[in-house]
Amino acid sequence: SKGLYQSFKVSNAEYVPAVFNDLGFPYAFCHHFTTYLVDRPEGFSRAGAEEWETGDRTGLGKDVSVIMVMNEAFSDITDAPAFPYTEENDPLPNLHALRRDPHALSGHVVVPGFAGGTANTEFDVLTGMQTMALSASTTSAMRVVNRNLDSLFRVFGNDGYETSFYHPGDNWFYNRENVYRWFGAEESLFIGDMEAPEYKGRWVTDDYTADLIERAFEEAEAPLFHFTTTIQNHMSYTADKYGPDYEFPPTGIP
């Protein structure tokens, strides 16, 4: 039961290998196996789903490279009244400058979870499907993917684009190594593939990751579709996240 499972003490509840090591493989595996079920929607049929497809349309405009970056745990805190700031101490000046650009389109994304489940947002954005619609118990959409799926990688790839995915974290986490292959990404790059990564605290910096993305764009021999999930802002969010000597910028909060 969920209550019994959560009653056991583990060294790090957020780190899956630690949970399996502390509770033992058979019990942890059997518990997690029950959370990966996908509910069949009422009235669903494969034939009916195929009728929804309207066919591909190509040649509607100039092919341009598309780069998507999902910044780990990012949120526009200036939207929340709990975080006041002065104009001089705007915590997100670059974001706000981009929003004001007359050529920019901006908006808000509502993600399928809070304080966890990073890969669920990746799944929703790339496939157009919704994690929350899979089942009431699914903890991660990535853990139910086990075959090729249509995604933005395939949409762009079928139109002659090079496609790639970068994540400066472990390839096994959320089974990303396999899932992104099933999504259709031609190239996947993880922390084990990166040369001399730069760290800030425990995690690879966004600056280093941005340099990798820029290099991929410059070296592409065809229009590029690229998706990156960063990691610098990953938990934990303690005062020593970036080391004991890190000086935090002023908040502007009275």
For the regions a protein language model found, what residue spans apply to each?
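N-terminal secretory/membrane-targeting segments
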Residues: 1-63, 85-108, 142-146, 150
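Solvent-exposed soluble domains appended to multi-pass membrane proteins
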Residues: 55-61, 68-71, 76-254
